[in-house]
């Protein structure tokens, strides 16, 4: 979502609370829970899953391996659920021509650096840069080059923008900030 006036441009950034992350976390949780239940059923010799007889899988080595995969999957699933609940990567980009300041804010993982807040002067922005990598995994990323600071990505790498969309976004931002556009 973007909010824009004559002097201020605020762009909200979606973090890890995306439908695809919810789907992957749920699928991974259910699959790993199934693996763990099958491994536990083979160890106990009791049927914990009604549609799967435990006698078909012996505990050593199949039951151990399935239990290991189930536990590993639960750890990965809990990591995904934590990133979703903390909304890692969300935030905003604020460009204020009136004050001459650019503020970039992102939420990180809990701890000392939970809040990532970068502040720059607009006069320190050298250019808006588009980096394009074509191929099977095409990638188009919009960067802001800051004098003495390097490049700061403004779009996520998984944000699959078409060439027209990324060009339009770069042109609007460069026009708003009154800086040149570079394409790599």
From Swiss-Prot:
<feature type="transmembrane region" description="Helical">
    <location>
        <begin position="19"/>
        <end position="39"/>
    </location>
</feature>
<keyword id="KW-0812">Transmembrane</keyword>
<protein>
    <recommendedName>
        <fullName>Photosystem I assembly protein Ycf4</fullName>
    </recommendedName>
</protein>
<keyword id="KW-0150">Chloroplast</keyword>
<keyword id="KW-0472">Membrane</keyword>
<dbReference type="GO" id="GO:0009535">
    <property type="term" value="C:chloroplast thylakoid membrane"/>
</dbReference>
<keyword id="KW-0934">Plastid</keyword>
<dbReference type="GO" id="GO:0009522">
    <property type="term" value="C:photosystem I"/>
</dbReference>
<dbReference type="InterPro" id="IPR003359">
    <property type="entry name" value="PSI_Ycf4_assembly"/>
</dbReference>
<keyword id="KW-0793">Thylakoid</keyword>
<keyword id="KW-0602">Photosynthesis</keyword>
<dbReference type="GO" id="GO:0015979">
    <property type="term" value="P:photosynthesis"/>
</dbReference>
<comment type="similarity">
    <text>Belongs to the Ycf4 family.</text>
</comment>
<keyword id="KW-1133">Transmembrane helix</keyword>
<comment type="function">
    <text>Seems to be required for the assembly of the photosystem I complex.</text>
</comment>
<dbReference type="Pfam" id="PF02392">
    <property type="entry name" value="Ycf4"/>
</dbReference>
<feature type="transmembrane region" description="Helical">
    <location>
        <begin position="57"/>
        <end position="77"/>
    </location>
</feature>
């Amino acid at each position: 979502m973007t909010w824009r006036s004559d002097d201020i441009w605020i762009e909200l950034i979606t973090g890890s609370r995306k439908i695809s992350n919810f789907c992957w976390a749920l699928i991974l949780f259910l699959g790993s829970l199934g693996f763990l239940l099958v491994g536990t059923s083979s160890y106990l010799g009791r049927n914990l899953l009604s549609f799967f007889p435990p006698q078909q899988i012996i505990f050593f080595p199949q039951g151990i391996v399935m239990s290991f995969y189930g536990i590993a999957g639960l750890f990965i699933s809990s990591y995904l659920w934590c990133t979703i609940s903390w909304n890692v990567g969300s935030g905003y980009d604020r460009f204020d021509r009136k004050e001459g300041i650019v503020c970039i804010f992102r939420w990180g993982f809990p701890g000392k650096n939970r809040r990532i807040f970068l502040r720059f002067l607009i006069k320190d922005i050298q250019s808006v840069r588009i980096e394009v990598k074509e191929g099977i995994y095409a990638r188009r990323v919009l960067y802001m080059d800051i004098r003495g600071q390097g490049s700061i990505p403004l779009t996520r790498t998984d944000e699959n923008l078409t060439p027209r969309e990324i060009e339009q976004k770069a042109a609007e931002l460069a026009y708003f900030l009154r800086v040149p556009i570079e394409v790599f």
